[in-house]
Amino acid sequence: MLFRSIPEIPYDMDQVIKTIEHRMETGSRFTIVAVAEGAISKEDAALSKKEYKKKLAERTSPSIVYDIAKEIEAKTGRETRVAIPGHTQRGGQPDAQDRIFATQCGVEAALGCLRGEFGYMIALRDGKMCHMPLEDVAGKLKYVDPQSDLVREAKALGISFGDE
């Protein structure tokens, strides 16, 4: 059984608990609860935009899913685990076209670097590879601190930044 919560349909926590308890009573040993980004309870949906923003600002957990899990565990007495698949859920096994596109992006990026062109994202537009300024796609450039742990760790793994 899978319970899903999506922003378009505010959930009723009492109903979620009833569903889980019913499954436990009928012998089910687990219930999967899938919570989408932006999921909202009926109580929160009834708040004004200002009240809801204030509530979100006061939240101590990084996501509503942790609040839901905590409440399920408190009300059912059952262990509750959270798994956030993030971008991996959009993935899957790459096919030939994915590999070709990745190669095209890599080649175009490398050629741009050789020409001294930086601050661009490679994109496919109208069937052709093109350079898009990062300011246009990301709002602003985000710089990596060369002294950061991430850079140090990458170098320890043998990744070159062309500076040594």
What are these language model-derived features?
Residues 8-10, 37-40, 85-90, 125-128:
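Short, ordered loop/turn segments at secondary-structure junctions
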Residues 29-33, 69, 73, 77-85, ...:
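Flexible, glycine/charged-enriched surface loops at secondary-structure junctions
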Residues 45-48, 92-100, 132-139:
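Short glycine/threonine-rich loop-to-helix capping motif typified by GTGT followed
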